[in-house]
A protein has these predicted regions:
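Perimembrane helix-loop-helix junctions
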Residues: 2-5, 151-154, 158, 162, ...
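Membrane-lumen/periplasm interface segments of specific transmembrane helices
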Residues: 24, 195-284, 301-315, 366-392, ...
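Membrane-proximal lumenal/periplasmic loop motifs of glycosylation machinery
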Residues: 26-36, 50-71, 78-88
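Short acidic/glycine- and proline-prone juxtamembrane loop motifs at membrane-interface regions
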Residues: 35-36, 127-140
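Transmembrane-helix motifs of polytopic, lipid-linked glycan transferases
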Residues: 89-110, 143, 147
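Specific aromatic-rich, kink-prone transmembrane helix
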Residues: 101, 121, 140-157, 163-169, ...
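Hydrophobic, aromatic-rich transmembrane alpha-helices
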Residues: 262-295, 299, 337-347, 356-360, ...
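Short periplasmic/luminal acceptor-recognition loop of GT-C membrane glycosyltransferases, typified by
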Residues: 483-488, 498-539, 565-573
Length: 611
């Protein structure tokens, strides 16, 4: 018995979770296809690190994000070598550092049991292991957020750590400006938790560094903030606005796309979103908290998560720029929501009939949302499987399928029907889980720990299913023909492209965002800076001179560049560009270029030169 009490079971479970997280992250780092944001950040950052251009420089590269989003990965490549492999290995290091900070914080807030739970939530999350293993700013920001919270969250933090955390919060904002709302919340929390002296140090240090960053890049850094402010109220900032009609401004995006984006977010972040909602509903009264410090930490974390969630939900779902960014945007700040859950449930809950009823409704909504994510897999099946009783014209008792009801009564298109069917299937599974939870609690199969409370036991059951289902359902889906050789194949294709273009050539780029990182392997060639974006640098209308100053371009400029370029890199699927214009024009000569093994999992690029 003495050995059993000392056996480090929780520690072993935690370590196994960490090992699984590392293993899955390594897999995704070596197999995930590159995306436009990754390539654009890496390429622009490398150009900035080499001193060829500077962030916010007129007639340079479009700096639509805070400077450190480019400079940090840029200098990593400048110091350790340019390429996708080097950048992703750095992203892995940042991811593992973040995980260590999360473990430290959950231990502080909830103890080692919660630390083990959180470790496995990260390890089983496809979203966490895939996003944080790519060279994207989400991983940088999440790591900074985690460690500034290590420095500032809780009682009796040393003043030096409070100042360090405050400075790190500014560095975080200068990596992604969308985290700006966190700055005042952190300073207010430090005043509240650590007192006036610590608060003044926090305010002074963060304000000084914030001003210093702006002084370095003044005045063009105001491009970051001018787009957030109403143009009618701030005409004095028009010099920092491109005053252009972007291509995405003309898109017509239907509500189905928004609904599916929400479903993706629920599937990717089920534990955090559902757990956060449950923690709000069951939030314990102030007198039940173990300490005032934990209560203050929970309030701060909850307000931070809600503020950032609302801000990023508006930016994604209610704007045209990136509807499908609802889930990726949450990767910046989901740590705050996770720590809120730990903080609340490690201090107990407050339950009542009203809270219980509200919790059931919320859980069923999340179950329906999770079900709707799988509409392509279970949509058609659900339309036939779900049956409603009815009496036919002959007075006979029979059944009608959900598909028949939605077709003949509501006249809905098949795509909508499949989403409704999948959501209803998810809700029915949720009802089944409620019944299972009631049976377990009713017959006292769980008598200790969190199982003593029916509401918390039910929430735990839903969270368990929401964590386990995605990796189980998606097993094998992430494999590509390139498998874990993707980085090797990408490097081979990048070097082959570099070998095909002579030094000092002026290159016209019309590749996809997934191809941008191939440019990292090219030295001593010149590009038209506005073309090197993830597709967002193109505008439909605007003054050409003004656009060029901001690093943007339109059709008129594109035609001019086509006339002056030496080499042309073309992707067949590029909008407003027809590959046949180059293949059938005698002015352009095809250049032999073989993407070799990368062509198994990536679209082919075509290379031409001016005759």
């Amino acid at each position: 018995m003495k050995f059993a009490r000392k056996f480090p079971l929780i520690e072993i479970i935690t370590i196994l979770g960490a090992i699984l997280y590392v293993a899955r992250s390594l897999y995704f780092a070596h197999s995930s296809l590159s995306i436009g944001d990754e390539g654009a950040y890496l390429f622009k950052g490398l150009v900035f690190a080499r001193g060829e251009f500077a962030p916010f420089e007129d007639y340079g590269y479009w700096t639509n994000k805070a400077p450190l989003a480019f400079l940090i990965p840029g200098y990593i490549q400048y110091w350790f070598g340019a390429g996708l492999r080097e950048a992703r290995y750095f992203a892995l290091a940042i991811s593992f550092l973040m995980l260590a900070g999360v473990w430290k914080l959950t231990n502080r807030l909830g103890g080692k049991n919660w630390a083990a739970v959180v470790m496995w939530v990260f390890a089983l999350s496809d979203a966490n292991t895939s996003f944080y293993s790519q060279a994207l700013s989400q991983g940088l920001v999440a790591c900074m957020l985690t460690w500034l919270l290590v420095c500032t969250l809780g009682e009796k933090r040393p003043l030096s750590q409070i100042i360090l955390g405050s400075l790190l919060s500014v560095v975080m904002v200068m990596t992604r400006q969308n985290m700006i709302v966190f700055l005042p919340l952190l300073v207010l929390y430090i005043f509240w938790q650590h007192g006036k002296q610590a608060g003044m140090w926090s305010l002074a240090s963060s304000a000084t560094l914030f001003i210093l960053f702006h002084a370095i890049y003044w005045p063009n850094i105001m491009q970051l903030w001018s787009l957030w402010l109403p143009e009618s109220l701030t005409p004095f900032l028009n010099d920092f606005r491109p005053l252009a009609v972007f291509g995405y401004d003309t898109f017509e995006i239907g509500n189905l796309s928004r609904i599916q984006s929400v479903a993706i977010g629920i599937q990717h972040h089920f534990f955090i979103l559902c757990g956060f909602a449950g923690a709000l509903i069951l939030f314990p009264s102030k007198s039940n908290w173990k300490s005032q410090s934990q209560f203050k930490a929970a309030i701060f974390l909850g307000l931070s998560f809600i503020s950032l969630f609302l801000m990023h939900t508006w930016a994604s779902l209610f704007n045209q720029f990136c509807i499908q960014c609802f889930s990726p945007y949450q990767m910046f700040y989901s740590v705050a929501g996770l720590l809120f859950i730990v903080s609340v449930f490690s201090n107990g809950i407050s339950d009542s009939k009203i809270r219980r009823a509200l919790l059931i409704v919320v859980l069923l909504l999340f179950a329906a949302g999770l079900g709707s994510y799988y509409f392509q897999r279970i949509g058609e099946w659900s339309l036939a499987a779900i049956q409603f009783p009815r009496v036919d014209d002959a007075g006979q008792f029979t059944f009608a399928s959900l598909g028949e009801v939605l077709t003949y009564i509501f006249n809905l298109p098949l795509d909508v029907q499949k989403r409704i069917g999948a959501a209803l299937t998810g809700a029915l599974v949720g009802i089944l889980l409620l019944i299972v939870s009631w049976i377990i609690h009713r017959f006292a199969l769980i008598k200790n720990g969190m199982g003593q409370n029916a509401s918390l036991a039910t929430l735990n059951l839903f969270l368990l299913v929401g964590v386990i289902l995605p990796p189980a359902a998606n097993a094998g889906m992430y494999a590509t023909p390139c498998s874990t050789n993707f980085l090797t194949y990408y490097e081979q294709a990048g070097h082959a492209l570099a070998d095909a273009i002579p030094p000092d050539s002026l290159v016209y780029w019309k590749g996809s965002g997934r191809h941008i990182a191939m440019l990292l392997y090219m030295d001593d060639v010149r590009f038209f800076p506005p073309q090197i974006t993830a597709g967002a640098g193109y505008v439909r209308a605007g003054d050409p001179e003004r656009l060029l100053r901001f690093g943007l371009f339109n059709d008129e400029m594109d035609l001019q560049w086509r006339e002056s370029a030496d080499y042309f890199i073309i992707w067949k699927g590029y909008p407003n560009t027809d590959l046949k214009d180059f293949q059938n024009d005698a002015r352009y000569e095809p250049v032999p270029f073989d993407m070799e093994n990368l062509a198994q999992c990536e679209d082919v690029l075509y290379l031409f030169r001016k005759r």
